[in-house]
A protein has these predicted regions:
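Flexible "stalk/tail and boundary" regions
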Residues: 1-15
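C-terminal intramolecular chaperone/autoprocessing and neck/assembly modules of extracellular spikes
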Residues: 19-105, 119-133
Length: 133
């Protein structure tokens, strides 16, 4: 574990081949494993399916953008806009002490799963209608 001369924090070794975790000054996080979150049903209460998921997804935009707060101003990124997510799924958005909004992308997975299920139901309904003609 340590801070290397190139300002990279590493755990597990001093090269990409032996690193288990690496965070650089640009804010990039690389690891050998997965990012996980507790999801055990024993830790959850008041479980409800997300209603109208497809209509919520339709209110979001998948966008490309460049950032104005990094050294690499030309690098193209993809993602969503926190304020737009907050309007339809506020539990996926937080705000830091400086008022900068953050998106917990993992918290959007449930919404996407339910919207796919809604689309599947629509497709199945259309198939049935076509078969019955």
């Amino acid at each position: 574990f340590g801070l290397d001369s190139d300002n990279v924090i590493r755990i597990g070794g001093w090269s990409a081949a032996t690193n288990r975790f690496q965070m650089d000054m640009a804010g990039n996080l690389t690891m050998a494993g997965n990012i996980t979150a507790y999801s055990d049903i024993r830790l959850k209460e008041n479980i409800k399916v997300i209603p109208d998921a497809l209509s919520k997804v339709q209110q979001l935009r998948g966008v490309t953008f460049t950032r104005n707060d990094t050294e690499d101003l030309e690098k193209l990124h993809t993602g969503v806009i926190a304020q737009e997510v907050e309007a339809v799924l506020p539990e996926a958005v937080s705000e830091d002490n400086d008022g900068i909004k953050n998106v917990a992308y993992g918290n959007m997975v449930g919404l996407l799963i339910e919207s796919i299920k809604e689309l599947k139901a629509e497709v199945d309904n259309l198939k049935t209608q076509l078969e019955n003609k």
